[in-house]
A protein has these predicted regions:
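Structured alpha/beta or helical-core interaction and ligand-binding surfaces enriched in interleaved
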Residues: 2-170, 174-231
Length: 231
């Protein structure tokens, strides 16, 4: 299926001024389609889920960097590792990053299939054995890799640690001990670069399809999720 037959959402960097001109706004249909067909940037290959701005404000690159998450409720600061991996390493890296979480985990599915603009719906499933979860996720590998309206988070609140595979297909790990996650990334030859910029830090476009929306509903059913919370 061609990109122009998919569903698109332009997403601007946080804090962008209202009325900011999109790099896509004056493109012909042919130029837009040509840009959206490009998946390879040097050695890095994107999935179908997302494409960078036409003017390449951020060039997709493999690597990871350290960051910090501030919880406004608890006023706690949690160390974070954010990573981008090329297509052929991405899903296996995500699966390997789940191992440090332990045997029993909670799962959050994030969807923006039926929402306009910003915002998404989160669906929760508590207490699932990690081997069972992995088996289910492998069945939905193509959708999870290529659907720009689906994200997933897996967490162990007792540790606490969390791994996200978000809508942009970035890998994000939270926890006070990040070494187990960094070890996985190094084993996958994903190198640390704390100056790395991610596709989320500039204008970009998401891609989805009706087929992926249907597969999301099937995944939701397989995980025993009924209702969710909008954000």
């Amino acid at each position: 299926m061609g990109f122009l037959k998919r569903i698109f959402r332009n997403v601007f960097r946080d804090g962008a001024q209202v009325g900011t001109t999109s790099s896509f706004s004056k493109l012909s249909e042919e130029d837009l389609e040509a840009h959206l067909r490009v998946a390879r940037y040097g050695d890095f290959v994107l999935t179908d889920a997302v494409r960078p701005s036409y003017d390449l404000q951020v060039v997709p690159t493999q690597g990871y960097r350290h960051d910090e998450y501030y919880d406004e409720e608890s006023h706690a600061r949690v160390p974070v590792v954010m990573a981008a991996a090329t297509h052929d390493r991405l899903f296996e890296t995500f699966m390997d990053l789940l191992d440090p979480l332990g045997f029993e985990v909670d799962v959050v599915l994030e969807t923006s299939h039926h929402r306009e603009g910003r915002g998404h719906t989160d669906l929760y499933r508590e207490h699932i054995d990690l081997p069972v979860l992995k088996s289910i996720l492998w069945d939905f590998e193509e959708m999870l890799l290529n659907d720009g309206c689906t994200g997933i988070a897996v967490l162990n609140p007792g540790v606490p640690m969390e791994v996200q595979f978000d809508e942009h297909k970035l890998l994000i790990a939270y926890g006070h001990d990040l070494e187990p996650f960094e070890e996985v990334l190094r084993e996958r030859r994903i190198r640390c670069n704390d100056k790395l910029k991610f596709i989320t830090e500039a204008e970009h476009v998401h891609s989805s399809s009706d087929q992926f929306a249907r597969e999301f509903e099937e995944l939701k059913m397989r995980l025993g999720m009924d209702c969710g919370f909008e954000e």
